[in-house]
């Protein structure tokens, strides 16, 4: 059976809770969104197994500037059924300007590639991959040089 409207709403609610928990350093609420055997990959850093979500968020929170960042997840593409699905999402991470003015800059433009499972009626993240907006997502473009260079890569 394909994803129901209720499933889609519950998954979008999970991502809203994820964004809020991550942006407010709520480690317990963040960890509650993942399975015990979760795998999290963020640009080459891998966390897996029990405690993966807690370990990942603690590592991320220790980065300079983390306290001024918000985590925006939007426009999910969901494919699956009532027991599991794959999700692809756009990601933006604005942060307060470090010079103290009431302005912001963007720390990250990227995308998420996730696998979710439904356990006892609750959707949870079992695989969570965070990447910059470069590489394979741009392979369909004949000219990627500008995007690659601006994202810190090579054309």
Regions found by a protein language model. Name each.
Residues 1-36:
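Short, low-complexity N-terminal intrinsically disordered segments enriched in polar/charged residues
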Residues 5-9, 66, 103:
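Short helix-capping and inter-helix turn/linker motifs at the boundaries of alpha-helical repeat units
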Residues 27-93:
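A solvent-exposed, acidic/Ser-Thr-rich amphipathic alpha-helical stretch
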Residues 29, 81, 118-122, 143-146:
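Hydrophobic/basic alpha-helical segments enriched in Actinobacteria
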Residues 71-73, 107-112:
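Short, surface-exposed coil-to-beta transition loops
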Residues 86, 109-142:
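Short beta-strand edge/turn micro-motifs at domain boundaries
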Residues 94-105, 136-137:
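Short, cysteine-centered beta-strand-loop-beta hairpins and adjacent loop/turn segments enriched
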Residues 136-155:
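Acidic/histidine-enriched, glycine/proline-rich intrinsically disordered or flexible terminal extensions
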